[in-house]
């Protein structure tokens, strides 16, 4: 939602700038949201979008017939969606799913949000689309060039990534530091589930969250 209306509003007000210049947003009501990847997180996003009165489309390589969502092809989702949100895993099939070709199939003025995996998006071709004015806004919580310093304070250093510097230069792009998981409740759940599974393993009991190949 920060990509839709702009976090810039809050920043401007903190600087005593209460003008409306550059803050024009768009309504989500009666618009179409496209959810790519309809697992638990994707379906949670679908419910949020419905709360704003949006029509919701879904695309998944392995669609779940039990999901309450209108499944369409990827091309149909790209062509019809005003908001596209990525929630699929990064695999050989989904690597650079968002690229020059798929961007060309999107509506002009589309909003793109990626909170899943950076490699889903070809960043250079995304930047190309941003420069051409294809997007109303882009929100990125993940990006291709993430490294072991992603959670460090680099405010006093020079960015080594020209790609990140270019993304940050666009007024309609919002980048966050891969913090979608960073809530008190989520961290408590991670700790509890990890300890419960470790205890079950030690006792030779069934692992509720066992990972298998």
Residue ranges and their predicted role:
Residues 13-18, 28, 97-98, 142, ...:
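Short clusters of hydrophobic/aromatic residues that line enzyme substrate/ligand-binding pockets
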Residues 21-108:
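Rossmann-like dinucleotide/phosphate-binding beta-alpha-beta segment
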């Amino acid at each position: 939602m920060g990509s839709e209306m702009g976090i810039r509003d809050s920043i401007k007000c903190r600087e005593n700038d209460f003008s409306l210049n550059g803050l024009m947003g768009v309504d989500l009501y009666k618009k179409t949201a496209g959810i790519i990847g309809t697992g638990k997180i994707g379906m949670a996003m679908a419910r949020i979008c419905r709360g704003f009165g949006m029509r919701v489309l879904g695309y998944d390589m392995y669609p779940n017939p039990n999901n309450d969502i209108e499944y369409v092809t990827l091309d149909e989702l790209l062509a019809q969606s005003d908001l596209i949100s990525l929630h699929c895993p990064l695999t050989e099939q989904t690597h650079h799913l968002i690229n020059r070709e798929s961007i060309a199939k999107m509506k002009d003025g589309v909003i793109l949000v990626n909170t899943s995996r950076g490699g889903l998006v070809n960043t250079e071709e995304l930047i190309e689309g941003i420069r051409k004015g294809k997007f109303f806004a882009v929100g990125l919580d993940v990006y291709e060039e993430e490294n072991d310093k992603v959670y460090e304070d680099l405010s006093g250093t020079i960015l080594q990534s020209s790609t990140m510097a270019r993304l940050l230069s666009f007024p309609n792009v919002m980048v966050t530091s891969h913090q979608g998981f960073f809530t008190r409740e989520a961290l408590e759940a991670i700790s509890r589930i990890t300890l419960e599974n470790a205890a079950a393993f030690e006792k030779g009991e069934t692992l509720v969250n066992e990972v298998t190949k």
